[in-house]
Structure formats: C-alpha cells, structure tokens
C-alpha cells in the first residue's frame, strides 16, 4: 500500500488511535491531513495539521479543500473523531446529546459529503468510520445509549453509502472496536475493562490501526463493519 501520491485525511488525529493512524499512513507512503480541535503543527512537510471542530460544516469543507490545495488530491478519509459518554439513560443531558451528535454524526456527515464529491471527480476513494462493538452487543455494566445511537448510525450509513457509490469506484467501510488501551482509560481501570472481552485483555492501538490498514488494502471489500474487539461481538460474555 505504498504510493507517495496518495493522500489520507484523518480526523481526531492529535492522540491515541488517530495519532497512530497518521504515522501508519505516513509509513505507507501517504501524505496526511490531520485534524483535531487543538492539533499542533507538524514538522513533517507531508503532514498538514488542520485545527478545527469537525462538527462545523465550514471546517469540514475547508479541510478537504486544504487537502486538495496542499497535496492535489484526497484518496482516503478516516472518520476517527468521536465522543464517548457512558451514563444511565435518564442521566444524559442536553449537553451530552449535543456533544455526541455533533462530533459523532455531524463530524462524519459534512466531511464525508465533501470527500465523496472529490472522490466522484477522481473516480476513486475510500471512507472508513471508527465505530464500536457496543452497537452489536450492549454490555450491562456500560450504559452508553448515545454511543449506540450515534455509532449505530455510522454503521448503517457505512452500508448505505457503500451501495450508493459502489459503481463509482468509492468504497466505504467501518472498524467496530472493543475497548482499546488509549490515554482515555487510566491504568487502574484496565483489569476491569479487559474482563469485558472474551480474549481477556484490552486491544492495543496498533491492533485498531491494523484493522483500518486491512480495509485500505482490501480492494474487494466495501460495506464491511470489521470487528476488532477481542471477540466482544461474537456472542454473550
């Protein structure tokens, strides 16, 4: 998957999985446009850091426009930016609703529209959503209906877009994750979180990245929700 001419746009790219994806795509020869609200400039001339709130339609449009202006094209969009809020259903607030809908759905919708317009002009492109296995297998001790609502919407949109654009050289996929060992999970929570997976451990950031890279390479795969979750979605646990 090495081609210096190709360009990937990655949201939520300042830390964790997003930061790892930036490096992985650079290692594969891609130039990268990396976005988050507070991302810092990169010393790598082939990484354009673009700060802004991806839920803002104007930011989404500018992000794709800047990618084309700087690097001449866009080949892959990874919708990695996300908010996860776990609390009892009746405890969710209007602010929780706005944050989850804004980042998880609006943050997918507007930039994906802009990217697909570009892909149509090129006759090729790939979109990947980062989702969660909680959509398929809710966990009694993890009440997170807003994650199921928003990420479930992404799963459905992934399949719908895959069919809509299959004849135009555009693939659309998603990676549904279990719990990944990122900075958002303090070390003292790891043992309890590991027990939620049949494999008995947390996923590593590299394992999430490997799922995305598999889909990037798998040219005959579209409309796929790839579970990288330690067996979580396979059955009751």
Segments and roles (model prediction):
Residues 170, 201-228, 233:
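C-terminal substrate-recognition "lid" of short-chain dehydrogenase/reductases
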Residues 51-63, 94, 207:
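The beta1-alpha1 cofactor-binding region of Rossmann-like NAD(H)/NADP(H)-dependent oxidoreductases
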Residues 5-6, 73-74, 119-132, 142, ...:
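Active-site loop of short-chain dehydrogenase/reductase
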Residues 14-15:
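Conserved glycine-rich cofactor-binding loop
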Residues 128-153, 158-167:
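Catalytic loop of short-chain dehydrogenase/reductase
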Residues 112-113, 159:
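A short, exposed helix-loop element centered on a Lys and neighboring polar residues
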Residues 88-89, 96-101, 193:
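Substrate-binding pocket helix/loop in short-chain dehydrogenase/reductase
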